[in-house]
């Protein structure tokens, strides 16, 4: 649920509230509705990127209220309105409480919380606090699934006049002979690298988050003798890269054996075993690992040899999309067995 807390300040000015927010790491931000950006409504945003603390951040607006409302609430001309979205993290809600509490100490006044009432702060016990690892995995998994959903939505409505003409040619022998000029088949083949990018991102970034945030994975990394190039050391010192990302790059996350090796070593998760299960995908029982390997091989042949699979239809490509989705689902289920709370929105 989104939470809005308004502080009807007793003694504040526009300049004072702006300086206050800036001093507390709020940055000026424009509202996405242009009409809301006026001299009487100055928007700010707080967002903490480190350790996935924020998911949506805290919105704050310095507002000049009407004379009628000023008398109604017995407050200053300028008030402070804050909002956290429904999907906001525990830390976002916590920051919202803190900024209103600090502002009230400085400017006085009465606060109204649209969920908890007058002079009531948000009860943080109503919100689950996730670890950095849990939030990181949730963000990575949901981001991966969202991209797969987007490509499915695009293809569901995709039509090509030439492809439809070729599909209706008779006899079948003639249609088979002309399949090489079907533009849709080239399109579906060219989208295979997209699926591999999702696979690489999902497994690679989850691995990097484990060795950054998971205690036993970090301990193992600390005991590891890893050779690091001087250029990588400089990148770390400049905060242009991290040790976790450099270690991640030492594995090939477009290769299932390499993925399995990395996960087994640092997380004790056997990816091959996890994905070897037989599951129903698009109405058929498949071994997910086998189909995932076929996707990786198809991408390799297309990229390096321009090998076109002329049997790859829209339906078959969408089965591949579902296969990657199932691989993500099975991996998250395995991670949850270790006691991690992962929120999947799809």
What function would you assign to each model-found segment?
Residues 1-36:
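Short, extreme N-terminal segment that most often corresponds to the first beta-strand
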Residues 12-21, 90-96, 310:
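Short, conserved charged micro-motifs
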Residues 24-88:
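Short, intrinsically disordered low-complexity segments
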Residues 181-185, 310-315:
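Short, surface-exposed loop/turn segments at secondary-structure junctions
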Residues 268-303, 312-346:
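Amphipathic, Lys/Arg-enriched alpha-helical patches that create a basic surface
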């Amino acid at each position: 649920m989104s939470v809005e807390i308004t502080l009807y300040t007793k003694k504040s000015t526009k300049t004072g509230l702006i300086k206050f927010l800036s001093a507390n790491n709020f940055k000026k931000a424009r509202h996405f509705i242009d009409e809301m950006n006026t001299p009487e409504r100055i928007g700010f945003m707080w967002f903490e990127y480190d350790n996935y603390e924020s998911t949506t951040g805290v919105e704050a607006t310095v507002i000049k209220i009407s004379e009628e409302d000023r008398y109604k609430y017995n407050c200053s001309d300028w008030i402070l309105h804050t909002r956290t979205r429904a999907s906001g993290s525990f830390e976002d809600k916590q920051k919202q409480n803190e900024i209103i509490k600090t502002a009230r100490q400085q400017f006085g006044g009465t606060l109204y919380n649209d969920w908890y009432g007058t002079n009531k702060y948000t009860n943080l016990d109503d919100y689950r606090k996730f670890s950095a690892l849990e939030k990181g995995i949730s963000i990575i998994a949901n981001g991966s699934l969202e991209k797969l959903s987007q490509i499915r939505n695009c293809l569901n409505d995709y039509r090509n006049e030439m492809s439809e003409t070729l599909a209706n040619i008779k006899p079948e022998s003639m249609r088979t002979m002309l399949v090489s000029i079907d533009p849709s088949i080239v399109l579906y083949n060219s989208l295979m690298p997209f699926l591999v990018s999702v696979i690489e991102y999902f497994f690679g970034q989850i691995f990097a988050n484990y060795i950054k945030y998971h205690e036993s994975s970090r301990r193992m990394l600390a005991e590891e003798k890893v050779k690091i190039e001087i250029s990588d050391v400089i990148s770390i010192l400049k905060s242009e890269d991290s040790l976790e990302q450099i270690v991640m790059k030492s594995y090939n996350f477009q290769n299932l054996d390499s993925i399995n090796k990395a996960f087994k070593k640092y997380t004790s998760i056997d990816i091959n075993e996890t994905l070897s299960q037989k599951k129903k995908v698009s109405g058929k029982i498949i071994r997910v690992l086998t189909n995932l390997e076929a996707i990786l091989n198809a991408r390799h042949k297309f990229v390096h040899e321009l090998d076109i699979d002329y049997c790859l239809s829209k339906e078959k490509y969408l089965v591949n999309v579902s296969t990657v989705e199932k691989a993500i689902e099975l991996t998250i289920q395995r991670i949850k067995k270790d006691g991690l709370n992962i929120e999947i929105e799809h």
